């Protein structure tokens, strides 16, 4: 367990402890945690809240009109508009007991979002993960968010939070895809070594197997660290790849935010019941 994870109901509480305490999972096993990904529009948010998912993941950006007073909205690039603002999203999510992961797509959206979160903090007694891609990763060509101002801004509002800090990545079906290099994991450790908060590293499923040595090294650096395996819609990876990860890493340190059909097949292979 993460030594510096917060106490019950804090934003940095380890999600396994939180959901065990609420009798929503049966073991300290990251594979038991279920996710609803991209709960951005109102329809998806409502579906996520009605679902059996433990954690709701959503994306926050500033709308494309660029006006000075624009409110943070819930959308994933290339979309730049939404029927849902962060404020409306939080109002709905507060009515549940689900954990939250907010993925920030620009530095500009962070401070106004933290101000909105500050207004509802007393109603959010659950894990809150704050995510950004802060380093270039394998085949990564999208813009990274500058780590220092991002971390400083979040911590100035909420020192007691869980960070999810990733690399920009790409995946190409027609060529050999390199994994996470030693340089990439060492750069990440250099940044996270200075933090006191729990940190999870979102890593792309199709790139993990060829990066096991590097990622095992990274996780051994602190008991505050974990991995969250995610998948691109068109990525080519097998359930065997997921089982390989399962066999080589501590079950308490790896979460799986993966798409169907692999999610179902993987859970079936390891004997975890899937509520569809």
Curated annotation (Swiss-Prot):
Superkingdom to which the source organism belongs: Eukaryota
InterPro entries associated with the record: Memorin
Listed GO biological process terms: photoreceptor cell development
Gene Ontology cellular-component annotations: extracellular space
Protein family: Belongs to the menorin family.
Annotated function: Essential for survival of retinal photoreceptor cells.
Protein name: Protein FAM151B
Organism: Homo sapiens
Lineage summary: Eukaryota, Metazoa, Chordata, Craniata, Vertebrata
């Amino acid at each position: 367990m993460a030594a510096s994870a917060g106490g019950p109901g804090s934003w940095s509480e380890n999600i396994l402890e939180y959901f065990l305490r609420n009798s929503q999972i049966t073991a300290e096993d990251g594979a038991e945690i279920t996710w609803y990904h991209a709960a951005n529009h109102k329809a998806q948010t409502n579906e996520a809240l009605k679902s059996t998912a433990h954690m709701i993941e959503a994306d926050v950006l500033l709308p494309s009109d660029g006006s000075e007073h624009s409110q943070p909205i819930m959308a994933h690039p290339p979309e730049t508009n939404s029927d849902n603002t962060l404020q409306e999203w939080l109002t709905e999510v507060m009515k549940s007991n689900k954990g939250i992961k907010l993925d920030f797509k620009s530095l500009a959206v962070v401070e106004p979002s933290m101000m909105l979160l500050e207004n509802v903090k007393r109603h959010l007694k659950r894990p809150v993960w704050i995510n950004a891609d802060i380093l270039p990763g394998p085949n990564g060509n999208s813009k990274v968010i500058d780590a220092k101002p991002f971390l400083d801004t979040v911590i100035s509002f909420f020192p007691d939070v869980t960070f999810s800090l990733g690399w920009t990545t790409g995946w190409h079906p027609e060529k050999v895809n390199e994994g996470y290099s030693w340089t990439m994991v060492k750069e990440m450790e250099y940044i996270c070594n200075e933090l006191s908060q729990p940190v999870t590293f979102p890593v792309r499923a199709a790139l993990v197997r060829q990066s096991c040595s590097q990622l095992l090294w990274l996780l051994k650096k602190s008991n505050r660290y974990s991995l969250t395996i995610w998948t691109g819609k068109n990525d080519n990876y097998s359930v065997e790849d997921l089982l390989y990860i399962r066999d080589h890493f501590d079950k308490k340190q790896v979460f799986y935010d993966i798409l169907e059909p692999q999610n179902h097949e993987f859970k079936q292979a390891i004997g975890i019941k899937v509520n569809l």
